[in-house]
A protein has these predicted regions:
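Conserved Ser/Thr-centered positions that define the repeating blades of beta-propeller domains
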Residues: 140-145
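Secretory/extracellular carbohydrate-interaction modules
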Residues: 37-102
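Flexible glycan-contacting loops in extracellular carbohydrate-active proteins
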Residues: 155-177
């Protein structure tokens, strides 16, 4: 069964805790720290690692999802899931507000960051983001109804190493904004390679 991490708030912790946040009815709301972001080096020439990230640590393979509702205001305001090994290796994926438009956005960082976007035609009230870690990759999906999920990115992430899993929000240019994360779930998946071994070595 999927674990509802909110029932065990002590299992999650902050990296760059924001000044204002609260957990209520299994949802977490925060006022995002102004002028904060996650990015390394490429294109812009700077490295920042100072935005709020609320996480628990998992080894092995898993599926994680969360519903995100944000009051995006300024260019680059963003909120999403984050999978982080360390300051040089992480993935963040969610919504990013750029040039007045909502973008399904993914940043994959291994020493340097990249950025991919899918621009949406209209503003949306919320989005679901799901990530599946299997072997040495993470598949990232989005949904507007938590029923039909569409792949938005498949990215490499080192296998067999613990990863911090949770949600982040950043406000690189603005004065902060409100965001709410709901229905956060992490589901353990049996190790793929072990399942294959079991098939060949069944009793």
């Amino acid at each position: 069964a999927a674990s509802d991490v909110y029932k065990r708030q002590d299992k999650m912790q902050w990296f760059n805790e924001p000044e204002q946040w609260e957990i209520k009815d299994k949802s977490l709301s925060m006022q995002v720290t102004p002028q904060s972001d996650y990015w390394r080096i490429s294109h812009y020439g700077f490295t920042v690692d100072d935005a709020p990230f609320y996480y628990a640590t998992y080894g092995g393979e898993f599926e994680v999802k969360v519903k995100i509702t944000g009051d995006y205001k300024q260019r680059f305001d963003q909120a999403g899931l984050m999978l982080r090994i360390n300051h040089e290796n992480y993935i963040k994926a969610g919504i990013e507000f750029v040039d007045g438009k909502y973008n399904l956005s993914a940043v994959v960082t291994h020493k340097t960051s990249d950025w991919s976007v899918i621009t949406l035609d209209k503003a949306i009230p919320y989005v679901w983001i799901k990530a599946v870690r299997r072997l040495d990759a993470v598949e990232i999906f989005y949904s507007f109804d938590d029923k039909e999920y569409t792949l938005m990115r498949n990215a490499w992430l080192q296998d067999n190493i613990p990863v911090q899993v949770g949600f982040m929000a950043a406000c690189p240019d603005g004065k902060g904004f409100n965001v709410t994360f709901e229905h956060f779930k992490v589901k353990h998946l049996p190790d793929q390679r072990r399942l294959e071994w079991l098939k060949k070595n069944a009793e």
